[in-house]
Amino acid sequence: GVTTEVISASNGLYFTIDSDTLDEILWIIDSKRLALGTSAGVYFLYGSETNLTVTPQRFTINKETSYSATNVDPVVVSNVIIYPQRGGREIQELEFSGAEDQWLQTRISMKAYDIISTSNITKLAWQERPNPIIWMIMDDGRVLSLSYDRQVKFKAWSVHSLGGTDAKVTDIAIIPKSDYDQVWFQVSRTINGATKSYVEVLTRFPSENVTTRNELTFLDCAKIHKATEQLVDSSGDPETALVNGASQSGTSLTVDGATATPATGTRFVIMKPDGTASTDTTIYETIAGSSATSWNLDRALASAPADNSVIELRLEELTIAHLEGESVGLCTNGMEHADETVSSTKVTLDHQLSTTAVSGLFYNASMTTLSPPTLDNQYNWNKRLLTLTALIQESLGIRIEYNDLTEELLFRSTQQNTGEPISLFTGFRKQTLSGIGWDVHTVKINSISPLPMQINGLSIELETGGP
């Protein structure tokens, strides 16, 4: 008989790219068409111009750009392919233009040459929410980001320097959540003379309104400490202790609502039954011999608490074992605390007022303005900066540097006591740049505390002094 081969749409396909060079296929990604990144450019595999479905009888392979790829996987943003060029120091954008019926190539890293040209890109990651950002891991351990919003034609580059000694980011992962994309980093550092590797996650912005003020985290390798964690049940869940019975006095307090015995040295205040502050603001401390239902105190009760009064635990000693020997930044109840050095896995706070604390490593957060433009007929004229107006959103702890001078933006009013928590500032803040020279045309803005700094806009007023 005669043997025949039937070719059907379900047959597997094997292609050889027709090219003048020996091209290595480095990645394949699905966009508007199937894209093949090679060592000699990017090819597209599709059925036909009228039907993109690939079958054994209908297929097309076209080379759309000669800009080579690397083995770093690209990202796709709104059907635009973004990939590192061979050498890993340029970023190419490949976009299909319906009006011109062709793929258009753009080198979007041109304005970031000074920060991207010193090392190679090893990984890309795309974060869609809350802000559209392309993250890039460099082989020297730095992290670059490109804020990328095609709808408003917005692109902005940033360099991210992580806190700690010899800090290097070795990997990144994006985990989509219901209302945002979670960004995870793997970071290596030298801690207490040894190299440590930790997995860290970026926390949420204040503007997202999902994180309490006390838990805002603007430190690296950070840890959140809660006073409630000092009293937990057998499953490790926090317990709330209540005063059991009115008219108590002396140095013993009968409690209920908790099954755990407080550790010696546990500090607390007695609130009202509804959880608000009472007239007794004394900070009590448990001593040896306490039980789950009877707490021995270091002093006599100042007044008889009401039945079912809430016992609010307070922090004084924090355990930060993963940063042994390091100087750490601290926030207590949403306000900056003096730096401390971790010794024997612990740091001791300067006060006993906080229910929540955040500890971690400081990182550099700053921005420098460009030299402002001049009129067409004033290119060689002298100019001097007069004022800087910043549009600030939910921020504190901002300092301006220029001409070897520093000026801190003040957000605390004369009616607020030093150390008293103040609200994050939102609005315009105008700063006079007094004493700035005619030859200084840039201003640096720094975050100087473990609190948020978000600058949404800058306006500079200047004067010109003739040629």
What are the roles of these predicted feature ranges?
Residues Y43-F44, L144:
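WD40 beta-propeller blade core
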Residues E5-T21:
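A short helix->beta-strand "capping" segment at the edge of beta-propeller domains
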Residues G47-R89:
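Catalytic or ion-translocation cores adjacent to nucleophile or general acid/base/metal-coordination motifs
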Residues L34-G37:
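Elongated alpha-helical scaffolds
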Residues G1-S10, L45-T55:
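Beta-propeller domains
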Residues A9, L13, V54-Q57, I61, ...:
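Extracytoplasmic/lumenal domain signature
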Residues D20-D23, S66-A69, V80, G87-G289, ...:
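Beta-sheet repeat architectures centered on beta-propellers
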Residues L22-D30:
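Beta-strand-rich domains and repeat architectures in extracellular enzymes and scaffolds
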